[in-house]
C-alpha cells in the first residue's frame, strides 16, 4: 500500500509541475497540494444566504487561491470548510466542461469528500466559484475534490425539455460515469468520479436492500438505510418554504414519501429566492423531471478513505425538482410535484385457518416511465418482507390491485404465486409481476398514463395453495342445444387429498351438430395467445394496453371453454372470431401491415370456478351435439 501511495504522490506531483496545461491537463499549477490541509487564518466568513451572488469565472481561477465551502456535518446548519484551489483541469468532464481541482481542510480533511457533499458551494473572495461534485480516486489521505464551475450549472436554466440519452434508470442499468485522466499525468490508480449521491431508504428491511443491491450498483447508486422526520403523506410545500434550502444546506430529491421513504441527498449550491441549484452533477440524468424536493437533516458523516457518506433524514417537502442534468439539478421552491398516491393493505395469516393480521401502508411515488415501475416493485417487495418474516417456507401470496387512470375505467388486476413455483422467491415474483403492469402502461405508444391513484391488497397464507388438474369427465357424451351438462374435474392439491369440482353449463342454442371439445384449463393456457399477439405489436396505444391487461384471467380459477373448429385471429387487444379463410390469408400475408396471430380454433367461455389456489394443467373433453 505504501508503494501504491508513493506512486500516486509522484504522479500527482508531476502533473502539478505543468506550467501551462492543455486539454485534459491541469493548467497553471506550480506547487504540490500534498502538504498541510488548508485552515482558517482569523475569523471564518459569514454564512451565505439566498439571493444574487457575484460569480468568479473559470478564467479568473488561479492556483493557490484560498476560499471556503459550506456543507452540513450534523443537523441542518452548514459549516465552513477551508478550501485551497489546486488548478483548472480543462475539458476534464467533456467538451468545454472544465473541472476545478481543490483541497479541503477543516472537518472535511477528517471525513474526506463524502457522499452527500455534492453541491456544497465554494466561494473565493466572496464570489461563488461552483459546487463540490467530484472526487479523485479512493484511499487518498487528502480530501481532494473536483468543483463544477457555477457557469456550467447556471446553463441548466436554458436547457430545453429534451431527455438525455444516458439516463440512469432501472432498465438501462447504466454504470456510474467514471472519467480517467491521462495515465501519463496521474497514474493508473487515479480517476475522477462524481461523488456518490446516497439513496436513503427509510422504512425498508435490510433484506430488501440486500436483494435490490445489484439493481442499485448497476445504476451507480449507493443505497443506504436512511430516515425521515415522520411520515410525509402530503406533497404540498410545507409552511415556510420561502426561507428553505439556503446555500450549503442539505437538499433531497424524493422518489417515495410516506410510510416508506426513498430520497437522494445532496447540498444546495445556489438559491436565487425561487429557483435552487444543487449537486454539481446529475442525480440520475433524467432531464426534465417533476419530483418532490425536500429539506434534509444530517445525523452524522461517516469518515472513510474509501466511501465516506452522510447519514440524514428527510424533513419537509418545500418544492419540486424541475431539471436533472449533467452539471446539476434545478428545483423550484413552492412548487408541488405530481405523484401517485398508493395505498397497500397487507393481510397475513400466521397459522393455517387462523385469523388474519392486517397492516396498512400509504405512500406517494415519483412519476417517471422508467422509475415508477421499479419503485412499485421495490415498495411491494418490501411490504411482503413483513409477511415473509413470520411465514413458513411453503407460503402463497396474492395481490389484488386497482389502477385508476385519467379518462379510463379502473384497471383491476390480480395474481397469485406460491413458494417454489418459479426461478425466484415468491415475493420477488409477485413484485416483478406488479411492476411489469406499470411498465407496459408507461411504454404505450401514444403517451404516458395519468395515474390518479393505486390501491392493492396483499395477502399471505402460510401454506402452498396449488392444485393440479388430474382428470375431467362429463355426465353425458351427447346433448342437444339448450340442454344442461355437468362437468366434473378431479384436482390434486399440494400434499392434500384429491378433490372434485362440479360445473354445470347449457349447450349453446346456436351450436351446430357434430362433435365439439370442452376445454378445462388454468388461466395461463387461455392468456397465452392474446399475450403473444400483444408482444407482436410494439406500437400498442394506452387504451389497447389497458384492455389487454384487463382481459388477463386470474390464475387462481378453473376455466371451462368450448372449442369450435373456426379460426380466431388475435389483433392487438381484440380477438376476431369466425374469420373467413380469404380474410385470414390476407391478414397473414407478408404485405399486411397488421400484426396478427391466428389460432385454428375459437375459444368460447362457458364459465369459471374460483378455487383460491394456483391451478395448473388442462384436460379436453368431447361432447357430441345432436
Where are these regions (language model features)?
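Bacterial N-terminal signal peptides
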Residues: 5-17
Amino acid at each position: 500500500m505504501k508503494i501504491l501511495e508513493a506512486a500516486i504522490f509522484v504522479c500527482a506531483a508531476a502533473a502539478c509541475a505543468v506550467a501551462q496545461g492543455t486539454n485534459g491537463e491541469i493548467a497553471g499549477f506550480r506547487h504540490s497540494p500534498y502538504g498541510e490541509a488548508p485552515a482558517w487564518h482569523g475569523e471564518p466568513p459569514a454564512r451565505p444566504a439566498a439571493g444574487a451572488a457575484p460569480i468568479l469565472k473559470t478564467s479568473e481561477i488561479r492556483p493557490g487561491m484560498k476560499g471556503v465551502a459550506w456543507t452540513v456535518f450534523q443537523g441542518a446548519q452548514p459549516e465552513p470548510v477551508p478550501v485551497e484551489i489546486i488548478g483548472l483541469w480543462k475539458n476534464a468532464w467533456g467538451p468545454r466542461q472544465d473541472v476545478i481541482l481543490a483541497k479541503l481542510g477543516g472537518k472535511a480533511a477528517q471525513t474526506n469528500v463524502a457522499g452527500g457533499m455534492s453541491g456544497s458551494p465554494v466561494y473565493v473572495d466572496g464570489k461563488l466559484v461552483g459546487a463540490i461534485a467530484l472526487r479523485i480516486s479512493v484511499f487518498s489521505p487528502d480530501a481532494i475534490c473536483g468543483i463544477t464551475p457555477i457557469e456550467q450549472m447556471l446553463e441548466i436554466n436554458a436547457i430545453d425539455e429534451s431527455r438525455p440519452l444516458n439516463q440512469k434508470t432501472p432498465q438501462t442499468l447504466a454504470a456510474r460515469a467514471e472519467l480517467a485522466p491521462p495515465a501519463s499525468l496521474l497514474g493508473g490508480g487515479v480517476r475522477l468520479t462524481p461523488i456518490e449521491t446516497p439513496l436513503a431508504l427509510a422504512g425498508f428491511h435490510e433484506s430488501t436492500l440486500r436483494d435490490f443491491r445489484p439493481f442499485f450498483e448497476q445504476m451507480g447508486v449507493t443505497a443506504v438505510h436512511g430516515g425521515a422526520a415522520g411520515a410525509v403523506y402530503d406533497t404540498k410545500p410545507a409552511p415556510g418554504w420561502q426561507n428553505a434550502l439556503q446555500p450549503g444546506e442539505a437538499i433531497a430529491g424524493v422518489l417515495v414519501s410516506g410510510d416508506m421513504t426513498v430520497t437522494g441527498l445532496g447540498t444546495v449550491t445556489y438559491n436565487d429566492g425561487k429557483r435552487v441549484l444543487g449537486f454539481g452533477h446529475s442525480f440520475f440524468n433524467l432531464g426534465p423531471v417533476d419530483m418532490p424536493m425536500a429539506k434534509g437533516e444530517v445525523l452524522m458523516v461517516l469518515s472513510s478513505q474509501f466511501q465516506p457518506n452522510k447519514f440524514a433524514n428527510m424533513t419537509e417537502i418545500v418544492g419540486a425538482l424541475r431539471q436533472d442534468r449533467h452539471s446539476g439539478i434545478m428545483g423550484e421552491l413552492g412548487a408541488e410535484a405530481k405523484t401517485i398516491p398508493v395505498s397497500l393493505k397487507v393481510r397475513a395469516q400466521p397459522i393455517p385457518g387462523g385469523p388474519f393480521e392486517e397492516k396498512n401502508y400509504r405512500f406517494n411515488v415519483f412519476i417517471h416511465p422508467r422509475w415508477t415501475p421499479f419503485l412499485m416493485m421495490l415498495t411491494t417487495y418490501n411490504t411482503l418482507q413483513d409477511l415473509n418474516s413470520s411465514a413458513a417456507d411453503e407460503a402463497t401470496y396474492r395481490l389484488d390491485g386497482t389502477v385508476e387512470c385519467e379518462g379510463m375505467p379502473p384497471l383491476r388486476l390480480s395474481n397469485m404465486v406460491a413458494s417454489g413455483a418459479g426461478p425466484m422467491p415468491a415475493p420477488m415474483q409477485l413484485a416483478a409481476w406488479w411492476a411489469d403492469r406499470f411498465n407496459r402502461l408507461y411504454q404505450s405508444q401514444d403517451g404516458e398514463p395519468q395515474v390518479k391513484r393505486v390501491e392493492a391488497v396483499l395477502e399471505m397464507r402460510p401454506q402452498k395453495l396449488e392444485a393440479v388438474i388430474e382428470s375431467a369427465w362429463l355426465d353425458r357424451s351427447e346433448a342437444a342445444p339448450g340442454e344442461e351438462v355437468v362437468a366434473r374435474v378431479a384436482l390434486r392439491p399440494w400434499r392434500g387429498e384429491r378433490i372434485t369440482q362440479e360445473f354445470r353449463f347449457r349447450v349453446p342454442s346456436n351450436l351446430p351438430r357434430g362433435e365439439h371439445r370442452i376445454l378445462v384449463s388454468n388461466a395461463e393456457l387461455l392468456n397465452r395467445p392474446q399475450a403473444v399477439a400483444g408482444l407482436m405489436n410494439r406500437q400498442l396505444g394506452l387504451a389497447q394496453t389497458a384492455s389487454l391487461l384487463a382481459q388477463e384471467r386470474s390464475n387462481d380459477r378453473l376455466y371451462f371453454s368450448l372449442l369450435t373448429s373456426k379460426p380466431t385471429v388475435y389483433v392487438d387487444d381484440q380477438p376476431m372470431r369466425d374469420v373467413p379463410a380469404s380474410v385470414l390469408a390476407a391478414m397473414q400475408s407478408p404485405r399486411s401491415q397488421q400484426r396478427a396471430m391466428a389460432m385454428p380454433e375459437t375459444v368460447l367461455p362457458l364459465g369459471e370456478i374460483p378455487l383460491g389456489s394456483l391451478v395448473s394443467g388442462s384436460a379436453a373433453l368431447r361432447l357430441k351435439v345432436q
